[in-house]
UniProtKB/Swiss-Prot annotation:
CDD domains: MFS_Tpo1_MDR_like. PANTHER family: MAJOR FACILITATOR SUPERFAMILY (PTHR23502), POLYAMINE TRANSPORTER 1 (PTHR23502:SF31). Residues 47-58 have a biased composition (Polar residues). Residues 47-74 are annotated as: Disordered. Disruption phenotype: Increases the susceptibility to mycophenolic acid, fuconazole, ketoconazole and itraconazole. Reduces the efflux of spermidine as well as of histatin 5, a salivary human antimicrobial peptide that is toxic to the opportunistic yeast C.albicans. Also leads to reduced biofilm formation. Major facilitator superfamily transporter that mediates resistance to structurally and functionally unrelated compounds including cycloheximide but also azoles such as fuconazole, ketoconazole and itraconazole. Also mediates efflux of histatin 5, a salivary human antimicrobial peptide, and is responsible for reduction of its toxicity in C.albicans. This is Major facilitator superfamily multidrug transporter FLU1. It comes from the Eukaryota. GO terms for cellular component: plasma membrane. It is found in: Cell membrane. Keywords: Cell membrane, Glycoprotein, Membrane, Transmembrane, Transmembrane helix, Transport. Induction: Expression is positively regulated by the CAP1 transcription activator. Expression is also regulated by the MRR1 transcription factor. Expression is inhibited by tetrandrine (TET), a compound known to act in a synergistic manner with fluconazole. Expression is increased in clinical azole-resistant isolates. It comes from Candida albicans (strain SC5314 / ATCC MYA-2876) (Yeast). InterPro entries: MFS, MFS_dom, MFS_trans_sf.
Amino acid sequence: MNNNTNSNHNDIAPEATITQNTTTSVSNDELQHITNNNNVNVQSYVGPTDSVESSSNTADEENEINSFNAQNVKDYEANVGGELPPDDELSRIESNTELSRRATRSIMNTESLLRTASQSSKPLPPMGGGKEYPPMLGSRDPYVVAFDGPDDPDHPHNYPTWKKILYCASVGLAALSVSMGSAMFSQASADIMQIYHIGWTPATLTTSLFVFGFASGPVIYGPLSELFGRKLVMVPSCLGYVCFSFAVATAKDIQTIMICRFFAGFIGAAPLVVAPAVMADMFNNRYRGTAIAIFSMLLFGGPMLAPILGAFTVKNSALGWRWTSYFCGIIGSLALFMNTFLLQETHHPLILTRRAEELRRRTGNWGIYAPHEELKLSMKEIVENNIARPLKMLFTEPILFLVSLYNAFIYGMLYLFLTAIPLIFLGEYHFVQGVAELPYLAMLIGILIGGGMIMLFEKRYIKAMEDNGGKIIPEKRLEPMMVGGFTFVIGIFWLGWTGNYPQHVHWIVPVIGAAFVGNGLMLIFLPCFNYIIDCYLLYAATALAGNTFIRSAFGAVFPLFARQMFTNLTIKWASTLLGCIGILLLPMPFVFYYYGKSLRHKSKFAFVLE
């Protein structure tokens, strides 16, 4: 049995008949639900949870799971009368008991679980009291709880705007606090070196351990949030982040700092996966892409703002380096308060489960149930679905490996600049600490512009999809990357070669180059996820799990060698090296744009539209 993700809830809809051979084929009409369902965009930061593939499934079982077909929708529309809005397939599925039950079992592979249970040789436990086993219920369908149509006020898509904004603010603040925590402590490295008599690399490890923790944490939190709900995962995560942040601030030795930094990142990582899922729970396809793009800008903005706040904090003699963690803990405490007292559960299956519980209590009919109550999760499944198969897929799928490599390089560059910017403006231009970190604002501006450009490209993508008969076009996701690759390379050379000559070049010139770098980072990073999701669809979560592993490795390692590289090679030549790597990766989106479809034809996991 597989654990599931929010992506999977929407990727398998009644209108899709998808068979898995060498290539997964989807007919034009059957794909409409997929093109309408951009819920998979949450995987940009949701990271890995599962796929509908089961390592123990036979080919027949997989076909049975994936054959949740369009006839169900036709029957439903015939019974209800008229079509439901095409942009709300999830509401349509969940508002019909039969579709809801079958969707949940298909997505979570519950059918194979039930078959395994029925075939078990283990004897049933007795009823007790000498009673015989009661007779089986007839049809279970009348007992399945579902939403009362797509306009059900309990469905998160129908929440009032103020409630959606409040919930987004709650989970968004939690995500911002964690992303800031990844970078703010980097400004304390010099003080850490002096106080604990360690070198630069061990001091930088405090940042790398945090990044590795909060980049790999979603491997666990994704499936947990799908099984137990968003809030039940968010609150303990926020609490753990606050506790370990304060533990870092009060630590007496470097070992405690290292350990607590890792656990602050790992335990506090839930907002990175749950926050986009909450947004996807509440927004339909018309607004979901915008919400996720804004969240992406927020997540990238945290590491840009954090060094500025951290530098001025460390510089202030009344505060000092410990307050970089105190501030993170305080912001995290506010997020903890909001998520504890203001956030309510938005995960659709959990809402139905609670409705079923209330109906059982108030009616006394204990046969009433929600499909989600049939599910369970084991550590074995987490390991298989989120570690073993993603790694296998990463190294056997050329599209996934190369795009993930580009994505990981960009992610590593984000944290490499925590060292590069101060070296240029503190070391070359002799700005004081705090002021030397202000150029991060230029990178932030570039990121915000990049986010706006992605929204414009999203409109182009939707129009191209409509012109193509409503069929999804994965290669169209690469257009922002084509632009971002050039702006990133231009920015790297601009920043490095102008920043190396402070006696001849005004400081504003490399600052402008930093804005180009930020713009390129955003234009490359988010479209990489969307392209992977569109290419692998049913296996998107597994593909993104593999992406997360390589991305977290790059994010953790890059800060460790950044200072030595920029010091030994000088700023201009270190930037040249990075720029040349960017040039080598530059053709990738163009190659996949023109040849991606033929590569997908040869893939065991990707799908091709027929």
